[in-house]
Curated annotation (Swiss-Prot):
Record protein name field: DNA ligase
GO cellular component: cytosol
Lineage, opening ranks: Bacteria, Pseudomonadati, Pseudomonadota, Alphaproteobacteria, Rickettsiales
Protein's UniProt keywords contain Metal-binding: yes
Gene designation: ligA
Catalytic activity, EC: 6.5.1.2
UniProt keyword terms in alphabetical order: DNA damage, DNA repair, DNA replication, Ligase, Magnesium, Manganese, Metal-binding, NAD, Zinc
PROSITE patterns cross-referenced by the UniProt entry: BRCT, DNA_LIGASE_N1, DNA_LIGASE_N2
Family note: Belongs to the NAD-dependent DNA ligase family. LigA subfamily.
Amino acid sequence: MQNIDLISEQEAKKLLKELADKIAMYNHAYYIEDNPLVSDSEYDQLFNINLKLENTFPHLVLSNSPSKKVGANITNKFAKVIHQAPMLSLSNAFDEDDLRDFLERIKNFLRINEFTPIFCEPKIDGVSFSAIYKNGLFITGATRGDGYVGEDITMNIKTIKNFPHKIDNAPEFLEVRGEIYIEKQDFLNLNKEQEAQNRGKFANPRNAAAGSIRQLDVAITAQRPLKYFIYSGGVTEQNLASTQEQLLTKLKALSFSVNEISKLASSEEEIFAFYEYLKTNRHNLPYEIDGVVYKLNNFAMQNRMGFIARSPRFAIAHKFPAIIGQTKLLSITVQVGRTGMLTPVAELDPIEIGGVVVSRATLHNFQDIARKDVRIKDYVFLQRAGDVIPQITGVDISKRSNDTVKFDTPVFCPSCNSKLRYVSEDIIIRCDNGLNCPAQNYERICHFVSKNAMDIEGLGRKQVAFLIDKRLISNPLDIFFLKEKNETNLIRLENMDGWGKKSVANLFKNIEKSQKISLQRFIYALGIRHIGEQNAKLLAREFGSYNNFIAQMELLSKNDSDIYQKLNDLEGIGDKILVDIVDFFYVKENTQLIKRLGSVLNIEDYQETREQNILTGKIVVFTGSLSTISRVEAKEIAEKLGAKVTASVSLNTDLVIAGVNGGSKLKKAKELNIKIIDEVEWLAFIKNA
């Protein structure tokens, strides 16, 4: 990137637009998909370039500038929760000079000469959340979202061990804010479980926590080892205490978990000493921290300082430097995932970083390799900040030799040699060859047999690779004819290396056992991109039986608009997922395989767990403002009674509940002659349901 100190106004205008688009994409990947595309340090670098350009050319600041936004726009998978006060992020200090500037700004703003006490806390590398209590009862939990509107994760938070559902001696209204995280050892154990179940491993504890708390299926969240710390009282904190130190004491007395590792610093020297102490000892903590948060201790002074667009003036995060190492890049391998996405991985001369021997590192994406000019046989800099595999941050050009080799971004799939499809400016590259691609086929079979899919015990990744190599299976269907094929083979499976009579007998028994399966698990086992367990359940619930499901999907592949609209109305099935479903069933091989699987499996119809009642299976839409209960509560009640609540009115809608100012949804319902009731009728309706 060119020297931004010498950049022209025209160049700055263009670069600000590029930065806004790129940072928005990175925010979406990090906050919404829990799948970061770049390292924290690279993100911070881009963000700081954006800030510097905006300071130099303030008249060029865009309306969608990342400096004005927190997090990312939320999805439609969860109900929305409007925060009582914005949940902003913190500005960053990367060195002592940045921190001294922060302390000087406090003095200048408050017009004081003396040092005012600063409260110092570890910066937990987790997921921010808010929790609301009324009369001591926990009623609403939400993610940060975009800072102003979060996602409703109330039921998910309730699964966290030791999180209080009821508080004694609490004020009438209470908000607390904190961080949800997973401890290091729990994270390692979780990834072992993921691997054993043929499921993807999480990149780091933060990603695992984010992916766990944002599950549509609360039962999955309940299985995850989530913990939390509370660090703020939100809009109510100044009713509880007059300082941050007093607040944490009060929150602890109310039975919340607070971080005991904190310090009230009375001088600049004490701040730096606390930072050095945590930086040195962070590896001994059971959880990941990535810096220290400093806040003015006095709430009255915090009020005087106020906020800027996306962060408070009275607080700052002092980031730790990542653990750095240097080693030789031996090669770059390209992995092809189950859905065809290609990922570059650096193969390294083994090196110890932070007590862990590292032989592989992530290169994030192919654009990243070109931007950093990473070449095979280069000496590369690594950083490790809690990731399972570290990140390559740059190249030691001074050690570059003449025999280094530039990496060519693949044009053809390394597994099947088919032409690749480039998505998002080379950041994402896909192979669209599906089952005909050996790598995708292998990953898809591994997913098919995994615990939450067909659940065939004794058939893990190693065994699948062996059976494919010996040409005993080539697709999921072959698994169910393996016993028959084995009986006619010259060399039987039980006589091959790594197998025995008992293990083979158990495998065949487990294969037979797996042939009776619920519709939702069967749909999940198919491995459709973005169709996880919850979305598989939504589809199973919508179509009811295997025969109806496959018939409707065949119509969808032929561009049937009614089926398309029906899927589009399902809460949780957005445009992106709908495109993935259409793409999957457009491939004839996929449909043929599913039909053949249907002939050998006993796929059970979807069974609703709740009792049947008047609302079961009905599609309901809420519009306008309700006065007696919130929209979120109304939605939960409707779903508990078996209804499907959707966001838009269509021909498939059975009932519209209209509050005050119903708007366009109410108008459309009248045009389509859909039954409409008001709030009073709705309350009477659910009472008798």
